[in-house]
């Protein structure tokens, strides 16, 4: 961590970079470097199918230290890997597409965007039609009971 901190400090001082972020760092790994230099971002695996950062204190740590979380693979395995978890989510999500008059992917992005940590989804598609729809994920607020119903479907149990 000290070698990384020294290298980043040098790059910041030289004006070669303006901000520094990490990827997939745990709170303890982040803290080792954060004690030496400011960390602006942590890119983590986060989606409705991969929401452990909500229960392992990763997101709480980032909120405390004002580190902006970026979610890579924000749609998770929802469209890729049928499982008991995705079936539970689909059962809750499909009626919400009617309620909110939107597509499943937009609801999945909206769910992430409503987290109080201010998570920034990293979009991995190059499909222009899908990219064109993405701004609609910011045009409505999912009701809290729907947000929690999706989280519970993902967890397979009542959430804390």
Protein language model features and the residues they cover:
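Beta/alpha (TIM)-barrel catalytic core signal, keyed to glycine-rich beta->alpha loops juxtaposed to Asp/Glu
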Residues: 1-160
């Amino acid at each position: 961590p000290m070698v990384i901190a020294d290298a980043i400090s040098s790059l910041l001082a030289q004006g070669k970079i303006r901000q520094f972020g990490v990827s997939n760092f745990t709170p303890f790994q982040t803290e080792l470097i954060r004690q030496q230099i400011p960390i602006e971002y942590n890119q983590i695996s986060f989606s409705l199918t991969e929401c452990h950062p909500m229960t392992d204190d990763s997101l709480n740590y980032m909120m405390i230290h004002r580190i902006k979380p970026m979610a890579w693979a924000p749609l998770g395995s929802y469209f890729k890997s049928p499982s008991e978890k995705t079936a539970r989510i689909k059962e809750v999500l499909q009626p919400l597409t009617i309620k909110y008059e939107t597509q499943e992917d937009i609801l999945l992005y909206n769910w992430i965007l409503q987290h109080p940590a201010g998570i920034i989804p990293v979009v991995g598609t190059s499909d222009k039609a899908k990219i064109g729809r993405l701004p609609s994920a910011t045009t409505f607020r999912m009701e809290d009971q729907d947000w929690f119903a999706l989280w519970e479907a993902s967890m397979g149990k009542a959430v804390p």
